[in-house]
Amino acid sequence: MRTRDTTLLTPWIISFWVQTSALFASFHNQNRLSASSTGANDRLIGIVGDRRIMSEPSPIAPAEGKLGILTPGMGAVATTFIAGVLAARKGYAAPTGSLTQQSHIRLGKRDEHRNPLIKDFVPLASLDDLEFGGWDPYSDDAYAAAMKAGVLEPRHIEGIGEELRMIKPMPAVFSPRWVRNLDGTDQVKPETTHVDQATALMEDIDRFRADKQVDRVVAVWCGSTEAYEEPSDVHIDLDVFEQGLKNNDEAITPSQIYAYACLKMGVPFANGAPNLIVDIPAMVELASREGVPIAGKDFKTGQTLMKTMIAPGLKARMLGINGWFSTNILGNRDGEVLDDPESFRSKEVSKLGVLEHILQPDVYPELYGDIYHKVRINYYPPKGDDKEGWDHIDIFGWLGYPMQIKLDFLCKDSILAAPLVLDLALFMDLATRAGKSGIQEWLSFYFKSPQHAESIHPENDLFIQLTKLKNNLRHMMGEDLITHLGTEYYDES
């Protein structure tokens, strides 16, 4: 019997084993790539230095024709987003804060110096090809709504005033049971049953497609925070949910009716609020059945954005935390809605969950096992959209000596949220054309409470989220994934 001499293979095997071991250690500590970040069916075919080489992805359909963006809710966030895109199209202002428009992405090895803009690397819809629509319980057109919101100065709105006036919201599915503290709503759909409301929304989507002559449509929730709700029996699976629509089940919310209508019409849906929407089993099932992407939830903008920057740094240096007190002052419509205790509860749950998964108190009980974490939101009308987020953090270091961090972030809530709406719309459209469906965890970068598979915890570290997002883009385009191992620059062979 002939035997094969494997002597020449031994160095290669050892090298491959060493690099693989180092790679997995690196992933565990810093670049934990879940199945959703590379695709559950992707096959690892090799590792070269700090690059993870995967099997070829599916082709991406080109971004031909127009993309329609529907926003349930056309208040401060939606109109700031729309006005910003229109201004950028005319060259009046830059789309600052948008990864799709301004961020570069590294490709290959560092010494190759390949760093294209994301929008030049992946086939995204052009800003010139976007059309806008949406629903709102107030009948103000986008111009009037933007002026009332007071986010943008009139001089920034007037140059695009004609286009804004042409964007009129469709009558909304709305219930004061789920969104309180809003008075004077003047265009609510007359349909009284859930199934009729869903049908009316689907007809709206069809009409929007025809009127705007768009080839594709995505939806991004920009509406108000609904009262807190735990999943109930009607949310367990799609058949039960659809029966609940027919029976007018009181546990089905307006936002869930929007999501159902969109997914049934093949429209990807991203949830920018803490509402229970596409993160119920029934919607996950529907998205999978229809082959439509979903993502959520709750735009990560002001105070929570800062938390997901600061907490990873403290953890990286193994600095302990005794307490983290956060308070917010804001005076826009969002603040008015959140002045209701039940709506605030939805936001509180979303904001409180961030630190736990970053700090891992079960792994580091001596550092983070006894944190006192409190979040407060205060409605103060004079603030308008100029939100103030104040954080007091009690930390401890070497030998347990105490220290403090105080952060006062004076931000404009809608200015931070608007580029997220743009990026999510373009990336959800990209995901659709790339054949992706169901939960898009790679978009967790944009959310306070990222939607994820039931078997894993969410990833809230902003920097790991960005690595996940960019590696997904690299994989879509057949580029090597970046692991930051970097050993190939120091090989002594």
What are these regions (language model features)?
Residues 39, 46-49:
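Residue-identity detector for glycine
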Residues 243-251, 290-303:
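Acidic, His- and aromatic-enriched active-site or binding-groove loops in soluble protein domains
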Residues 350-353, 357-441:
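Glycine-rich, aromatic-lined ligand/substrate-binding cores of catalytic
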Residues 297, 301-365:
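Conserved anion/nucleotide-ligand pocket segment
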